[in-house]
Swiss-Prot record:
This is ATP-dependent zinc metalloprotease FTSH 5, chloroplastic. Zn(2+) binds at H512, H516, D593. One of its GO terms (cellular component) is chloroplast thylakoid. Heterohexamers with FTSH1, FTSH2 and FTSH8. The active site is at E513.
Amino acid sequence: MATTSSNPLLLSSNFLGSQIIISAPTPKTTTKSLPFSVISRKRYQISQSEKLMKSLPSQAALAALLFSSSSPQALAVNEPVQPPAPTITAEAQSPNLSTFGQNVLMTAPNPQAQSSDLPDGTQWRYSEFLNAVKKGKVERVKFSKDGSVLQLTAVDNRRATVIVPNDPDLIDILAMNGVDISVSEGEGGNGLFDFIGNLLFPLLAFGGLFYLFRGGQGGAGGPGGLGGPMDFGRSKSKFQEVPETGVTFGDVAGADQAKLELQEVVDFLKNPDKYTALGAKIPKGCLLVGPPGTGKTLLARAVAGEAGVPFFSCAASEFVELFVGVGASRVRDLFEKAKSKAPCIVFIDEIDAVGRQRGAGMGGGNDEREQTINQLLTEMDGFSGNSGVIVLAATNRPDVLDSALLRPGRFDRQVTVDRPDVAGRVQILKVHSRGKAIGKDVDYEKVARRTPGFTGADLQNLMNEAAILAARRELKEISKDEISDALERIIAGPEKKNAVVSEEKKRLVAYHEAGHALVGALMPEYDPVAKISIIPRGQAGGLTFFAPSEERLESGLYSRSYLENQMAVALGGRVAEEVIFGDENVTTGASNDFMQVSRVARQMVERFGFSKKIGQVAVGGAGGNPFLGQSMSSQKDYSMATADVVDAEVRELVEKAYVRAKEIITTQIDILHKLAQLLIEKETVDGEEFMSLFIDGQAELYVS
């Protein structure tokens, strides 16, 4: 190979007859340089002329030859990026010459010849990467900060990325093959910011835990607290130092007896000396019992407003929480707060949520509710006592409460808040009419008589619905029509005014409802007819309203004749259909009537002793509630023969009622036609208009 002395990068040196020529790299070079000794070592390992090099007399002589230069600065050559750095190859210029006469030439290799077996692309598989390392094709690697990815630089200066698995031998493999190893410092390698970032998360975590526990010690239990983990055991009761319920006994109507009992409790709190001077003890608890909507919670609010002492209020369901033991902890916390404010009142609404009978044995394991009620029993009348704290509680299920909770010393008094009578309903209607524009034609007495069995909540809803109807009709005041329509809406649902009813169906419904009304009007000792309507409401195509006796409702006592009349009235609709339209054209409209008749007849036989064959014996006792420690289902305490007798007696009572109804309708068929025609024309007939059909006096009460 010829060289030119004018090229400063081509140097020659003669040593014992051998000539070493260092040729310049190809024009594609970079500015970064490496020592020639490093280049010689790397290229010597991969030289294809290794055998020829071994033919030299001595490797030491060759090393001396390579490092003998008068100008060390000239032994630095540029490291190319593409193609790779030059290598040292030893070639024999003439095989016939002696060893000392051989020429050793260092030339730049052909890049394609050495890198042709490297993988393509910038993303290598791990197996391809290991294969290239073992072949010496990888010059250096740089690991990511977490060690999951590395970036390699091949001998041809190509770069690729490899996803690194968890291989503990990788570092040893790289070191054995002379690969330069480094680790990325990450972006923005500022040590101060890295240090702060590493500390930030632990500081935030500890700060959050500290804040939560501080909130648990003085959080939701106090005013404005956010609560915390420790707050689970704290009571959720609302505390009022000076109760501002806005309710007094003057706002409570229709519960005079209950007010009298509770006014005495208020007097205990205001003037305790008057009672203690006579040796009387202040009652520790007062249980308000009554149906839903009778005003139990309203009475408790009135007590708070009248007493003027600190008032705690909570719902029993708030005691039981997700975690075991929280209920008992909250009971303790509630009474600790109450004792610190004594004398005071603690009101627990719907106490049956935690006060149910114990020992049902249904769930297995420990019942959280039992822990809560045990703690409540201890706080109300336990070893330490709770002097100065009066507990008010309300429930509509007194039958499910534990007997230990109802004994004297805990709930000393049970105040029954029952449905109001006529006088009470009049007072309640007046209370709920405050702030409403009531017309002069409204008679509270008549409205009260049309609403037997209504509670205070029902009457409040009635007046509210009447006000809504008046506003919908763009009226300036509430008249009796709005109250009447609101009453029917509450009882039977809204009118279906847009329902398309054929004339045939309207005629059928008119005769059906006329049959009910006619039989009811001519039955002795039965409720008077209040209104008849064939306007569809809810699931009913027509309705007949009767005004039940106030005395009968309050006493709950029904005679045998009344129950027999009730069955006959219920069958009057089906009888009218049969008489007018024939047996083949009767409809399913009497299905609810049959259910009512069957229920009344079976109760007369099984419970009320109105059957001669069964006698004064109750058969088929009601099943107990298994969650109250009672039997899972009712036991059949009678034989199959007795069951057959019961069925026969029920059927006989129903048949007798059917005969009575049919006799009335066939006898007074003219009045039936008049009433049905009036209903077809007007769709609604009130009780007075209906009774005017009997002015001629020809119709007489049915006598069996």
